[in-house]
């Protein structure tokens, strides 16, 4: 995917995730949409910073970088949705492009992708981006309903019960 595809994904995610978090469709939904926009776009564009240095789709396109970004909310509360932008960037590059990404870099240089991807110049790139974004939103909705409140990070009751039963 290219920058346009990643920004399209982030904009659609901000709209969809706002309705997942605040489904009322009132002012609160639109405020949430505005609050989500910057961290999602930031996260969606961050992995491509490695085009200016390092090895593109390796240096900032891997699981160790995602783990660091997942830890952002612990230290920087206003960046709690950046990880979603980064994770969906990875998904777009794995599912939506022919090349894939080096998920296990720097341990392995192997790039992982699926054969359904298209070239960034393909006329189908935007369509595939929208389809992948809809799947991402469906997955985020399931996480929100069944696993964790994405706005607060609080586990749902069933998950909390399972976690409470684990030996410490």
What residue spans do the PLM features occupy?
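N-terminal membrane-targeting hydrophobic helices
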Residues: 1-168
């Amino acid at each position: 995917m290219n920058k346009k595809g990643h920004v399209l994904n982030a904009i659609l995610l901000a709209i969809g995730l706002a309705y997942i978090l605040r489904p009322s469709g009132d002012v609160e939904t639109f405020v949430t949409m505005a609050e989500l926009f910057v961290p999602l776009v930031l996260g969606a564009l961050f992995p491509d910073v490695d085009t200016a240095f390092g090895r593109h789709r390796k240096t900032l396109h891997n699981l160790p970088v995602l783990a660091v970004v997942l830890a952002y909310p612990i230290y920087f509360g206003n960046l709690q949705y950046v990880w979603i932008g980064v994770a969906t960037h990875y998904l777009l590059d794995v599912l939506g492009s022919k090349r894939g990404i080096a998920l296990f870099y720097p341990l392995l240089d192997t790039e992982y992708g699926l054969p359904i991807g298209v070239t960034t110049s393909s006329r189908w790139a935007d369509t595939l981006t929208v389809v992948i974004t809809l799947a991402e939103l469906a997955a985020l909705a399931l996480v929100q309903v069944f696993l964790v409140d994405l706005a607060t990070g609080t586990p749902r009751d069933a998950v909390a019960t399972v976690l409470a039963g684990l030996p410490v």
